[in-house]
Amino acid sequence: MEEITPRLTNVKLPVASNFPAVDDDFDNPLSAEGIELGRRLFYDTKLSGNNRVSCASCHRQNIAFTDAVALTNIGVSARKLDRHTPSLFNLAWSKTGLFWDGGSTNLESQAFGPLTNPDEMNQNLTELEAELKQIPDYVKRFKVVFGEEIKSANIVKSLAQFQRTLISDNAKYDKYIRNEDGVILNDLELAGMKLVKEKCASCHSGALFTDNQYHNNGLDASFSDDHEGIFQGRFRVTFNPNDLGKFKTPSLRNVMVTAPYMHDGRFNTIDDVLDHYNSGIQASATLDQSLKQNAGNPGIPISSTEKLAIKSFLSALTDHTFINNKKFSNPN
């Protein structure tokens, strides 16, 4: 008798009314079964070579899927990494590359990076396939979702499906913008919102609070080519001299729970970040034009009063629904 492949439950990403449209015509169509498989894999330490590290080891839901340390050493080698763990949300809108330098074009290819990196999960993909094939539940789930046995290409497809559902769109600010539940912003939050639009929106723009582009925000005056150019930002990918020192703009959403900050986690607090933009900008040939507007002094003037207002508004961008959503939590 011919085996009948189960029908999948197709999923369309929900898009809030204050969010831009999302191009969800993926080569890897979303299904409820694929998303659930991806969630289980995301939290499974079997994905690492020593069976001790999962994706969730560095991407913790309660802090918007980052890890609260500047440079983690939780990977298989216990060596401190060279870049800060980015948060994970609204990735379905990220079409300009992933990682801090855009070195990966999509979530599927991105997953191979940490899986095989000797300092992160240090996994041999052939051995991973063999190990997962020993688990009947995984064998069944992969067969349902992909109609074939477990393959590394389908492992990363499942992870990508789950990560595309990590949507953060329900902060206090969102409810205010959508006129929901009588939510209002107080005077300090409103003042901060105005200041963010005036002083930050050249990069942190739109409903996503990021332009998903690459900028040199004045962290350093020179850019070492040590560690295969990892400190050179986007240049490491494009080899365009105009991209030296440029890193991808992170979203301001959930920023109050995702310390420390920058691609290397150098700033411990939001105050440190604001002080950097006010008085710590390092000039270089590729410094972003928006940081050259201050009468010849690089940076963005931010007074202590303005700093309080900005922080108040940034707190209104914390999405407590997202960081507590059971759909994104460990299924075990």
Language-model features: where?
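Periplasmic c-type cytochrome electron-transfer domains
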Residues: 1-332
